[in-house]
Curated annotation (Swiss-Prot):
Belongs to the LolB family. GO terms for biological process: lipoprotein localization to outer membrane; protein transport. Residues 1-21 form the signal peptide. InterPro entries: LolA/LolB/LppX, OM_lipoprot_LolB. Pfam families: LolB. SUPFAM superfamilies: Prokaryotic lipoproteins and lipoprotein localization factors. The keyword Signal applies. Transmembrane segments: none annotated. The gene is lolB. A lipid is attached at residue 22 (N-palmitoyl cysteine). GO terms for cellular component: cell outer membrane. It is found in: Cell outer membrane. This is Outer-membrane lipoprotein LolB. Its main location: membrane.
Amino acid sequence: MPIRKVSLLRLIPLASLVLAACTTTKPTGPATSPTSPQWRAHEQAVQQLSQYQTRGSFAYLSDQKKVYARFFWQQYSPDRYRLLLTNPLGSTELDLNVQKNVVQLTDNQGKRYVSDNAEEMIRKLTGMAIPLDNLRQWMLGLPGEASDFKLDDQYRLNSLTYQQGSQTWTVDYQDYNNSLKPQLPSRLELKQGDQRIKLKMDDWTLK
């Protein structure tokens, strides 16, 4: 069944956006080598996280669309996760469940759609181009498929560049949660052309 584009995401109005108004603390200090043993140890510790959840603020900004929401991400296993977007009243606007090659999305009217490609489904139904396959890694502070990346002075990801076909994505890490072991990002921004995706993670739960 072809996926028809629907009017999803009547989400948070501009006045309620907290992301733009918040100051950020970008990791600073001299760049460190991606081949350093400290980075390898941190990378391996993060890669061992197979079950976790995080929640916070989400913004998608482009010339054609602006979406603001609260998000909840739960990773059940390496190939199974859930992404939930809600409005200020707590009502579900988008509920995405992915397990291996089966993708199910429920919209704000309770309609369900099934596909085998999460990125394509999100793009067709919402108009948002979100690199979900790599975002799962980037949220954790891992480079994913990107080979061009830089570290900060604490051997964490500071920025990366990823070429996806004709598109070039850049990711800037603006803050980390230093209370976690291993330390995980608390604020990052993705850019591609006129598109920007901002994520602010309020908390992490690791299992």
